[in-house]
């Protein structure tokens, strides 16, 4: 490793150089080293010899370059320049300079510097640097202006080319000049900050000093010695009495020798009695003394034994629970005791409260004498010994967090100090992998605990945040996640309780709550109020008084002062044990935390199996060209072996998977939870097969349920013959049908070549006997658990199909995240090999391997391969094909230059202004190895022109199908004079049974009428658009007429201008529809007459016979549902029944859409020969449309199912492709315009309809109204039926009635429009008693308004009639207009005979009469003259509804609309028609 120091214009920087990497130095902030005002860019790199160069100039120790403001000095240090020296052991000051008397002599220095106060560095953490004003001193690369400065441990000092690093025990030095010193040299190796094991820490074997537990028993003293209570005189008196009696007898009767014998014997008895007494007394005293001496010696030994046990206990406690000061030494020296405790140890989560008289770890057994009348001092001695050792004095008092919630009460600042001690103890001896802390505390107390943020245990790794909750934000951010974690752990315990297995949760969470107010309204409170020890969570509560504590607290600790505490209860038992807390005033807590923060705890030593290996590394190549794919394809033969590399067991130890039927295959299972590398191992296997075997020998069919990324990854791989995604209902059955079709195809080919196994066929293919390639087909499902859950029948059939197809070269590989409950007996028994990566739990591992091993896997890509019944069982690391492919070999040099700030929550917060990573001039996008290999295979395939294998699985129908992709759409090429039979191209059909997709074409003669049933919004209108344009493009407008009934949302309106369209109808155009119904009925009758006349059965035969053009009539109805409850429902349905029954032979065809089948009446529905179902919300409705179907209709716009023997699925075509530059309507308009311009022949007539307003002047010239008047008629308006001119013949009597005088006045205005012409032809006489004609009084021959004048007019009319009877018709006819006929009769008393004569003879003689009146008055009058006139007149205009008039008896009209202004009925010959008067 090299270090480079760069100095320029008072700026100093240091760079750790890594071999093979390049660096830049410039004034740009994005450079590796930024120097202000540098003025140039310096590139640092190594040449081929490994020498570092700056802009191609070698750096030999020192390189000086000219800069804009100052020289640029680059100073290069190597391992040889490094040294490390201890501080002097006696003095507190040392010098570094050029002089011989300096403690460290460096000749290159101009002036000396002084380093002092290093003897107290352990406490102060710094030394002082003193220098003169002529010496530039940099501390941490900042130039110091003061002459005396502090340098803390870890600080870097630079003085005149010398680099120093302050350490607690000495100085590290980098100098290119010799360093001479008498100081102790500490090490000769330069520290490598980037070494792989830098600051890594492995647990050492733990030394446990057990507390003595063997019982010590103090035996009771032996029974007291029994004292002889015989009194000496009892031995002396009897012989003395005998001597006395003997003397008395001798005195009475001297006997001689007998007396001597008796006296002698008595004397001897006396002597022996006395000696025996004193002898026994002496022996008793000795026995008593010995008993006492022996027992006291026994007690002394027991005392020593007890004392030894107590010392052993005290030592054990002091060893395992050292003081905080001792902990600091342990941490500082990186002692092996760090992180020594694990969750399996007996003292896990134990910590010291303080010093107290603690209970012995062993039992002292002594049985005190219950009762004795005599006091035995030895019993007192034994009791005294027993009572002396009741406790272990001044030993650590231990508490633990394993047995329920604990609580601290007392002053908060004292409790916080105790919690700090607990933090230090637990953090030092428990790894952050096993233990985490969460503090819920007041915001003002966070500063006190700020030092603890350095502890790795304070980071909640599951939430990636520090374990401090002190405000609303941190509460919501952390506690909600903790709540979920607790909930999951509780659920896990409940599930595991059924199997009686104990769960140890890691990490253990110590949940400290000093402020309950922060969680009082949070959902986590329900868990805080219970004991969570079982779930790996220890609760600690802090309150001022015991009354504030929750009821479930088991252990209570009262901190009374800094020197006194009391353990009140422990595990719910009252103990009241006082202790002395430890004083930690002189301990730097943050120093301990920082030292622990530097340690990276590695739990397990590295295995011989690599943690990861890339795909190309497994093949021991760097470039894809080196794979020699073509040669592998040429040499490898599947009928011999199918072994391909999958991973490594160790270095250079390749593990291969061979799915040859006689090896590991043909079928298998892959299991692995999320992030285990399950998909990657499948990808690597697919890639490995593709590299080793030709596309004609191996092919893949991927089942990617619900869609995913694997299908996209291999889309360009030639071996991929299909991907099955989104297997919903019918897609699952479609896939199964395709696979079964492939099996049938293979069986057919086997039969043709008289073989029964894929290997035999492959050999024939290699020999050229068989010509059609038939590769091994690998059906791979990346996630079959959900597929099996939602499509169980499909999975069952798939496994069964694979079992049948093993000899046909079918291989099934099923992968799942959670095999438990998914891998049934059928799947497991048919899967010869199993690949198990990391699974969620032991049950999953047992499910697939029948062992729990896979549950212990931690690395992604690590897997077990099991073949058969443990015939092969190996652990290996699978290859990773997603690695970056970089043939230049600099893929490891990509460096993230994002600068992060660690915020108050312990999270990384990017502070770069530009986070894009695109600051380089050129951004290089690297391929993955998988992409590179696929591209390489694709290029080989193209170069060798390899023929693609026929695909057994066609992709699902696209969601957009266009008519131009299915059939010719240029009408200019398609229109011809000869009428063609109609063929409708509906869309793209899918026939998986035949492995075919192509145009869905219907021959109209066979298809008949078409009914499409589908839910709204799924393409019903598009279906009609497609048919409209298909017909229009293939047939001229004179060959095909279309009537569009748009009962939906005006979807057919855009196509109304197509020249083939006769007319367009909406549901509210009742009159127009009624008129169309009559026209259709007339056309049916007309065409039937033609068939009858020419004795043919169809219009097609008529065309062939006569050569005449009778157009096809297409009736297209969108949303037939709207017919129901419409005013025209009955007549429309009756017409449609007739049309669907008779129209097909007449070349009149109906195509309709509806949302349900019962929208049509049964007779009509039966006549709809072709029924099509689109997606329907009511699934059962599909069966009503197409009958029993194999495939459901997908919930895709445009997808449909045709009723036929096989119920063909297809996707509706669209008449136009999507065009970014034009809207759909613009495309329609363009083609319509082109058709209109191209075609100059006849187009169909539309349905004539009454305009909203008809003005006399608008029609005067076009209809030649003056000529009509000149020919003896009054044009009055248009009829609604044919929109033809309606007129009143003046040569016949007529009667006009209306409801009100205003209408009469309007009628008068229209009648008199051509008054001049009338005057030329007629002598006009008007009898106008009501005044509606008075505007014309001066424009006519005679006008009568008053009663007498009316009589005169009447008399004139009678005389005129008589004169004409005598003389015959005059040169000029007369026209009499009688307005208000009722009043006229009242005035003139005209007889009935005169009325008859005027009506019958008048017109013959040129006397024309016109009656006008109010309808009600005419009806209510009882004048016979009116009745006579009504019966004899055959021209009527009635201005009220037919149902309301009483002139004639017509059938009642249901729901007849109200007569609008200017509307009337013309009645003639007992028939009526509705008209509208001119305006």
Swiss-Prot record:
Membrane-side (Cytoplasmic) residue stretches: 1-229, 280-1479
Membrane topology: Multi-pass membrane protein
UniProt keyword terms in alphabetical order: ATP-binding, Cell membrane, Membrane, Nucleotide-binding, Repeat, Transmembrane, Transmembrane helix, Virulence
Cited Gene3D superfamilies: 2.60.200.20, P-loop containing nucleotide triphosphate hydrolases
InterPro entries per UniProt: Firmicutes_EssC_C, Firmicutes_EssC_N, FtsK/SpoIIIE/SftA, FtsK_dom, P-loop_NTPase, SMAD_FHA_dom_sf
GO molecular function: ATP binding; DNA binding
GO CC annotation, single: plasma membrane
Disulfide bonds: none
Assembly behavior: Homooligomer. Interacts with EsaE.
Notes concerning its domains: The N-terminal region is composed of two iterations of forkhead-associated (FHA) domain-like structures, which could interact with other proteins in the Esx secretion system.
Task performed by this protein: Component of the type VII secretion system (Ess). Required for the secretion of substrates including EsxA and EsxB. However, unable to support secretion of the substrate protein EsxC.
Family: Belongs to the EssC family.
Protein name: Type VII secretion system protein EssC
Organism: Staphylococcus aureus (strain Mu50 / ATCC 700699)
Gene that encodes the chain: essC
